[in-house]
Amino acid sequence: MKKKHFGIWWLCGIAVVLIGILLVINLSGQGNKAESYPDLEKVDAGAVPDGFDEENQPYLGNPEAPVKIVEFSDYKCPACKQWKDQVLTELKREYLDAGKAAFYYVDMPFLAPDSTLAALAGETLYQQNHDFFWPYFDLMMEQQGKKDDAWANKGFIMKLVKDNIPDVDLKRFERELDEEIYIANVKRDFLIAENHKVDGTPTVFVNGQNVEDISFEGIKAAIDNL
């Protein structure tokens, strides 16, 4: 009887260990499961305009001004953050706040899959309320992580929006983000970039002309030469 009981307990012990191992493997697999991101290759953008589609882009300054500055950008691009901090700040002070020019932001999410999610989130906020876009843009650049890290994930974006844009309809934003309601707009921006032979970010145009020197002085010279 003792041997029989010992055998039963031994089998039960093995079963418990195996169940534990399976649970650990299952939980580990769930924890390491990669987050899914929008796939622009599968998106039909419809008709793509010949120009920059300015009337549908977020802008700063005076849209009636004769000077139109367009930037193609990726939220994960370190050079884009630097350009925003050093050049856009000066352009805003010199031209945009004075009503002498308009600045348009166009998405070119090419660095990583979460670049596309970041662009989609910005577009989704813009469609809910145009005033929500620029706080999002500023905060995403200020809190930019390492280019090779998938920091622009849904959790990061939802927290950033919840903590910093108090008037947003958060449930609507999350639903539209999950359903990728405005992904065609992001794809359209990407195709506009391709049409203008944009091969990196930041790329800047002044009145339709690609500016090679995108320092403040270079852009000022391009404006002065119009």
What does each model-identified segment do?
Residues 73-76, 81-162, 196-199:
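Structural alpha/beta surface segment adjacent to cysteine/selenocysteine redox centers
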Residues 67-68:
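Alpha/beta-hydrolase fold active-site loops
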Residues 26-63, 93:
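N-terminal, intrinsically disordered, polar/charged segments of Gram-positive cell-envelope systems
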Residues 44, 56, 63-64, 112, ...:
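Solvent-exposed, flexible loop/coil residues
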Residues 54-58, 88-90, 190-192:
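A generic local structural motif
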Residues 57, 106-109, 145, 174-177, ...:
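Conserved short-loop catalytic and cofactor-binding motifs
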Residues 1-39, 72, 160-226:
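C-terminal cap of thioredoxin/glutaredoxin-like
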